[in-house]
Amino acid sequence: MDRVVIVLSVLSVAASSQSILDQRRFSIAVSRVQHIHLLAQKYFSDFESSLQTEDQRQVNKIFLQDFCNSDDIISPIDKHDTQRSSVLKLLSISVRLIESWEFSSRFVTWSTFPRNQISHKLSELKTGIRMLIEANQDGAEVFSDSSTFQLAPYGNFYQSLGGDESLRRNYELLACFKKDMHKVETYLTVAKCRLSPEANCTL
């Protein structure tokens, strides 16, 4: 009987330690994506402010007719769908969104911020989320690497562009990047909240 109690105590301590570790990892991941999202908002705002009134009107009109490459990634359609999604699903979608930008982010004009640093920050964030996925996988729901896919690059943006076309593509990339980082921040925040039973995870 005493041996059973000891085993149960050890298992309880191990589970508690794992939960604390998960919370810490989630906190780091949320903090990192918040930083990236703030950068995305800043550079999108700076880019808009640098445009002439007519240029701003034109790129806005064009972008409304276009869509983000990552729209092909199946994700929750609204906040209620997000709240109903499992932690593992939210983490897996977040990885896919980040993967779609690891290469593309190198071709965005980031003002004074080095382009490769954004890509590096995304890679670090993806590594952290993958660790969370491994820690939260179980037999009931498994999202393996085979379920992920690489999106095609954003059109022909990597070719030499000039004039208005270059302006338009940079605007599109900044707008889509900001949108996708907002999604990742939301998904990670909800997933982190799920680890706290007493927390209110309402968006």
UniProtKB/Swiss-Prot annotation:
Membrane-crossing residue ranges in chain numbering: none
Cleaved signal peptide residues: 1-17
Positions of Zn(2+) binding: 35, 185
Gene3D superfamilies: 1.20.1250.10
Disulfide feature: 68-176, 193-201
Modified residues (Pyrrolidone carboxylic acid): 18
CDD domains membership: somatotropin_like
Keyword entries, A-Z: Disulfide bond, Hormone, Metal-binding, Pyrrolidone carboxylic acid, Secreted, Signal, Zinc
GO cellular component annotations of the record: extracellular space
Any one Gene Ontology BP term: response to nutrient levels
Localization: Secreted
GO molecular function (one): growth hormone activity
Main location: secreted
SUPFAM superfamilies with a match to the protein in the record: 4-helical cytokines
Function according to Swiss-Prot or TrEMBL: Growth hormone plays an important role in growth control and is involved in the regulation of several anabolic processes. Implicated as an osmoregulatory substance important for seawater adaptation.
Homology family: Belongs to the somatotropin/prolactin family.
Protein name, as recorded: Somatotropin
